[in-house]
Amino acid sequence: FGHRFVQLCEIHDIPHTEIALEMGHKLTAEHLAPYEGQGYTGFLVNLDETSTGVLYDIHLISQFCHRNNIFLVVDSISSFLADPFNMQALGVDVMITGSQKALACPPGISIIVLAPQAVERVCSREIKSMYFNLKDALKNGERGQTPFTPAVGILRQINARLKEIEAAGGVESENQRMAALAADFREKIKNLPFTIVSQ
């Protein structure tokens, strides 16, 4: 799924460098070393590679971005609520997730969370997009609206799900519940006749 970021850069003629990893392998400091101090301005990463189950080291990536003053955009669709992720503590500029996966609602809503510096960046630029104009979304959000009619039913389900998570002890409790489910699943499949490809 990380390749989709590459496709987006290609479609919009954005100069980019792809760090292509072998399937199932994690990102290491050695992968990042050649890019230290090279003037990169943005780092796009999916926190968890859904197809292989590899969870990337977001602390490693965050530290690299801070050292190099790089804007960090994290796709956490398949890890949101399933793995610990503190956007503010990590200094992540933009976090993308969806209504499905661990949020456990039907697919159909994309959620983009902007840190204050990301809001400032969006508002200071001319945006040439009708249906994906974050400046319009922010402006409409000030009055509790969206630029276009959203999937209202799914928004109501997200609202109910967030209340459910809060009542059950909050995000940390949900992370622990997911970790227990994952450990149980891994234990039950470890003797089955197949190979797990992730490191």
Where are these regions (language model features)?
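Anion (oxyanion) recognition and catalysis
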Residues: E10, H66, K190
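Active-site phosphate-binding strand-loop segment of PLP-dependent enzymes
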Residues: H25-L81, V94
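Conserved active-site segment immediately N-terminal to the catalytic lysine
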Residues: Q88-Q100
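Active-site C-terminal subdomain of aminotransferase-like
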Residues: Q100-D184
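Conserved small-domain helix->loop->beta segment predominantly found in fold-type I
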Residues: R186-Q199
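PLP-dependent aminotransferase-like
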Residues: F1-G42
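Hydrophobic beta-strand scaffold residues
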Residues: H16, L72-V73, I196
